[in-house]
């Protein structure tokens, strides 16, 4: 039996079409009794656990718009400034309150965003 190096395998895979790669994956799954989908499904679970650990440390905060208040137009302007959204998207976000405006930001940023939104007339919560 001839020994094939990893480099030779990688080169062979690089030269394959998408259809050929799909067939190869199916054949490997059948040959070894595994599923490529199981690996993909396991990856987000690990990411979710890492996110849970970060939330416990409280280094990341979410800015949540509870209510736009009476000055809805001013709040929409501030939401656009903070998020970089277009006018339509910012309006939809404000109309769907309570809603997270920014997620996973530092405490300082969260407090700045909260101050801007409250100055515009909104009711805001930082979690």
From Swiss-Prot:
Q: Name it.
A: Large ribosomal subunit protein bL12
Q: Which GO terms describe its cellular component?
A: cytosolic large ribosomal subunit
Coiled-coil regions listed in the entry:
none
Family, similarity comment: Belongs to the bacterial ribosomal protein bL12 family.
What SUPFAM superfamilies is this protein classified in?
A: ClpS-like, Ribosomal protein L7/12, oligomerisation (N-terminal) domain
GO process annotations (BP): translation
Q: What does the UniProt function comment say about this protein?
A: Forms part of the ribosomal stalk which helps the ribosome interact with GTP-bound translation factors. Is thus essential for accurate translation.
An example molecular function term from Gene Ontology annotations: mRNA binding
Give the species: Persephonella marina (strain DSM 14350 / EX-H1)
What is the annotated quaternary arrangement, including any partners?
Homodimer. Part of the ribosomal stalk of the 50S ribosomal subunit. Forms a multimeric L10(L12)X complex, where L10 forms an elongated spine to which 2 to 4 L12 dimers bind in a sequential fashion. Binds GTP-bound translation factors.
InterPro entries recorded for this chain? Ribosomal_bL12, Ribosomal_bL12_C, Ribosomal_bL12_C/ClpS-like, Ribosomal_bL12_oligo, Ribosomal_bL12_oligo_N_sf
Q: Known Pfam families for this protein?
A: Ribosomal_L12, Ribosomal_L12_N
Task: For this UniProt record, give its keywords in alphabetical order, as a comma-separated list.
Answer: Ribonucleoprotein, Ribosomal protein
The superkingdom listed in its UniProt entry is: Bacteria
